Design a protein with these regions (language model features):
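Conserved GNAT-fold acetyl-CoA-binding loop/helix
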Residues: 28-49
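Short loop/turn motifs at secondary-structure junctions and domain boundaries
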Residues: 49-54, 148
Length: 182
């Protein structure tokens, strides 16, 4: 479990399906994150079983109420070092969404900062990236608030929609993160 001042991030559980559905059926959330809104409780149960059950996928819960307010995840990979092709970088990618009733309270940056620290401190990554649909201005804002640098826009295949889409990429290196901690 990862904790912040107001949140705890814990692995998803099948018993979270009802709360997931209530948030994920919102027409404003899924499309901004690149996935279809959940149409039924069964959709949420399937997403829990097939997607959110993966390691490093977390239910974001309000510390006071224990209610699910969103989702965050980490994916780890090795990539070629753009400065030295003989080396590999170990990076983490953060994904997140927060339910609309909880927007505007700084909860996404709070959770993303905790995941960033976890990736650097516990997994020793060289950098953390946030990749978001270019039209999702709120996600770009979260990245900026967390100290990430916007690297640009790429066109990539969105596996959820089956279409090519524009994605913004923001990066925070370990060195920049360490400087910001002082």
């Amino acid at each position: 479990m990862i904790t912040t001042k107001r949140l705890f991030l814990i692995p998803w559980h099948a018993s979270d399906a009802d709360e997931l559905y209530e948030l994920a059926k919102d027409l404003e959330i899924g499309p901004l994150c690149g996935w279809e809104p959940h149409k039924t409780l069964e959709d949420s149960k399937q997403v829990l079983a097939k997607v959110l059950s993966e390691k490093f996928c977390y239910a974001v819960k309000d510390m006071k109420t224990g209610h699910v307010i969103g989702s965050m995840s980490l994916k780890f990979e090795e990539i070629p070092d753009s400065k030295d092709s003989s080396k590999q970088l170990y990076q983490a990618e953060i994904g997140y969404w927060i339910g609309r009733p909880y927007w505007g309270q700084g909860l996404a940056p709070e959770g993303a900062q905790a995941l960033t620290a976890y990736a650097f401190e516990e997994h020793g990554v060289d950098q953390v990236i946030i990749r978001y649909l270019e039209r999702n201005k709120k996600s770009a804002s979260v990245a900026r608030k967390c100290g990430f640098t916007e690297m640009g826009i790429i066109t990539d295949f969105n596996k959820y929609t089956g279409k090519e889409e524009q994605f913004g990429i923001s990066v925070l290196t370990k060195a920049d993160w360490e400087r910001a901690q002082k």
